[in-house]
Amino acid sequence: MAKGDPKKPKGKMSAYAFFVQTCREEHKKKNPEVPVNFAEFSKKCSERWKTMSGKEKSKFDEMAKADKVRYDREMKDYGPAKGGKKKKDPNAPKRPPSGFFLFCSEFRPKIKSTNPGISIGDVAKKLGEMWNNLNDSEKQPYITKAAKLKEKYEKDVADYKSKGKFDGAKGPAKVARKKVEEEDEEEEEEEEEEEEEEDE
């Protein structure tokens, strides 16, 4: 089942994919009533492909090349970057972390070091419990820092939109945000888990 934009061009096929498609069509013609056993069929195709000469494979190579040209042309007309996502502008301001994520970035390494082999889910659960057990005054430093980062982010976005590029201002806030973002990007799965824990 295709996901996402139905207008997105069909993916390009490899020479082997064209070969398998041809084998499937041959099978249907010879045995229209016999359903294809996918595992067995794939194995036979693979074995047959390995024994074919370069000359025999060349027909499928040409088909794959033609399909690549078709795909590249359609993708160019289609617009969005591969995968249906717009390419991220590396200079665009990055979304700032919340107070909870700042807390997580500080305590996640400590939990991992004291609990070797702990799963992502358990780390997130522990972080969620720790955060929920903090009183307001203990949470305040993280919330204040997050608010400052958000304020700077909003200014950066305004700059970015007005100038068409991001003014790469240096400063402790940007450095702190960059550090947190790098860690967050590396552990996106953990963030998703942590968001759930924070909401509970």
Curated annotation (Swiss-Prot):
Disulfide bonds join C23-C45. It is found in: Nucleus; Chromosome; Cytoplasm. SUPFAM superfamilies: HMG-box. It comes from the Eukaryota. Keywords: Acetylation, Chromosome, Cytoplasm, Disulfide bond, DNA-binding, Immunity, Innate immunity, Microphthalmia, Nucleus, Oxidation, Phosphoprotein, Repeat, Transcription, Transcription regulation. Residues 182-200 have a biased composition (Acidic residues). Residues 9-79, 93-161 bind DNA. It is linked to Microphthalmia, syndromic, 13: A form of microphthalmia, a disorder of eye formation, ranging from small size of a single eye to complete bilateral absence of ocular tissues (anophthalmia). In many cases, microphthalmia/anophthalmia occurs in association with syndromes that include non-ocular abnormalities. MCOPS13 patients exhibit colobomatous microphthalmia with microcephaly, short stature, and psychomotor retardation. Belongs to the HMGB family. This is High mobility group protein B3. It comes from Homo sapiens (Human).
